[in-house]
Amino acid sequence: MAIFGGMSLDVVPALASIKFLEDVPRRALRAAGKEARWFSVPAGWPLFRSGEMSDSIFFVLSGSFGAFKAMRDGRSEFMGHIRAGEPVGEMAMFQGGIDIDGDGAPDNVPHTSSVYALRDSEVLEISRKGFEKLSAAEPEILNAMIRLILSRLREGNQRNRRTAPKVFALVATSPTIDLGLRAEALQDALKKLGVKSRIVEQVEGDEKPSAFFDTLEQENDVVILISTMGDNAWYRLSMRQADRIWVVARADAKPSYPLFPEENSPAQSLKLVDVLLLHHGAERKACRPADWLRAAGAARVFHWHQVKGDHCDRLARTIAGRSVGVVFSGGGARAYAHIGVVRALRELGIPIDFAGGASMGAVVAGCVAMGWDDDEIERRIRKGFVETNPLGDWNIPVVGMVKGHRVDNRLREHFGEAEIGDLEMPFFAVSTNLTDGAYRVHRQGLLRKALRATIALPGILPPVVDEGEVLVDGAVLNNFPADVMRELQRGFVVGCDV
């Protein structure tokens, strides 16, 4: 077990703050305090690992933990959150109190999962012997524990769902970036959504940092931590406490590699990273979204122009879990109906924050992500795919009935050299990978290349070969990739399946 700083403090108030112990008499809590040890676990450190013997129960006083199960391929699968006020390791401890080998003595059993601190956390530990002694003297403690275990069993698989992030770290990559004004604009946009938020630039008051952050979370819907990347205590603390990290950089700047040190803790896999590129004014500057995504190990890239406006509102909706993602299915000519869906959403004043799809649905989604208005989308789709036949360059059918040059030229004419990371909003297209039998999600690279892959109807258009893999129409394996959109963002998903 990796711990930091064992402490001997009055644990009765801490135990009384745990919800499932709130009805337990104070004398029982005082007895529990005599059997307990109070210590801290820094973010990313293990409380215990899978396979280690269990002889204690832990109570989370502040912070949070994540349970992870080791998979055969070496990955760690996230099993669920353990929040402040909940016990950890109770199942293994109770099971270990049974005589398994028949020698008349209770046996320890190994933990079946690893538990890591997701934030700087404080924990109370009570040994099995101490808990048994305590339960015999104060049965109400055991009754409370049984009620909690039964409640967890009723929850079943619901526990493995990730909780919505509440603490966001906005990390400037340069001291010349002033986040204050933009953070205030973001706070105003969140307020319009009915979301209470707090901007924090340092730990305030005399509380311990873990208790300070717990209080912030209880009092606010969203907490925004502002820091500048570098070797300073506040930056390191905000990185440990954040649920999601936003790397804020100038759009015309070049990243260094890597931005963050490599971490071996599976807890780091839950600290999802986004890149936020700042533009001055409405003009889009040449930027390097792919470089920033690689340098930060980021999942998404966003652009922010004017301090207040559509981009700020989109970020606020994304943070609040109120973003809107549209996903369009393939369907050949029927996919033109997606244009009507886009028009209807806009007429109703429903914003579109994410766009994606498969086959021709991805082409329409790409038009939306380019930032074109309704008339522009209709004009370009009509010109590129209706007024002339893009499949008219017939070929000896070796890999396709047509050569595909016309389609390539249409895509180049309308989408040019636009990179997916340069688009107005996060975008994806789905293609089918014939090499490994799975579908591929395109979220980086040339937009027209991703669209060419997702519309490569087998037997009609030649496939796209990318990095030695053969890609064809996304509709073959995932014609309506609503599941991909669900993974991309936490807000609403509007799907159109034709």
Predicted feature descriptions by range:
Residues 2-43, 83, 92-99, 137, ...:
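Cyclic nucleotide-binding regulatory module and flanking cytosolic helices
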Residues 11, 29, 102-105, 109-118, ...:
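A small-molecule sensor/coupling module
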Residues 20, 43-120:
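Cyclic nucleotide-binding regulatory domains
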Residues 122-148, 282-306:
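Helix-enriched interaction subdomains in cytosolic or periplasmic regions
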Residues 164-192:
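Glycine-rich phosphate-binding P-loop
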Residues 192-205:
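Short beta-strand-centered segment that lines the nucleotide-binding/catalytic pocket of NTP-utilizing
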Residues 210-222, 230-356, 366-498:
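Patatin-like phospholipase
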Residues 357, 361:
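Gly/Ala-rich beta-loop-alpha elbow adjacent to hydrolase catalytic centers
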